[in-house]
């Protein structure tokens, strides 16, 4: 079974996104995957990248001991499932801040001496799955270019195993969705995550 890190991002526990999180966790545990859940809001993760921390950009991760758990999780997992709402066409600031702070030098990538391109370090990660919601329609999101999807499927993926696959599981138009549509979406999440993990 797959070592799976679930990164959950939503400030309101009663949100539909929390139902999505529960559906993902239920599926993964039922299928006997090893799961670590990180609830960034509940943990009060600080997404703020300070000037002092940015000055440490090319130093080892040990210079930021407050991120040791994040580093260990990233090095442990074989798959990451991001569960979050899409806001303003992209990743919530909390998630973007987590990426900015934890996908760091000597963790996600390294720039060897004399080289002009970075090399990926998270080669243990073979699957990236985003499970998200959009307030607007799929058509509107296509017009906007889906920057959140691009961040995960392009920018993040290249720091992983060269055979890493990224999958996008989205419910579009949630602002005008019916209870039936939301329940149908929740009922299919397990199957869709299963396909993505193959």
Task: Please annotate each region the language model reported.
Residues 7-9, 38, 83, 131:
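Short hydrophobic segments within beta-strands
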Residues 2-33:
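N-terminal beta1-alpha1 ligand-phosphate binding loop
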Residues 62-144, 148:
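Helix-loop-strand module that forms the ligand-binding subsite of alpha/beta enzymes
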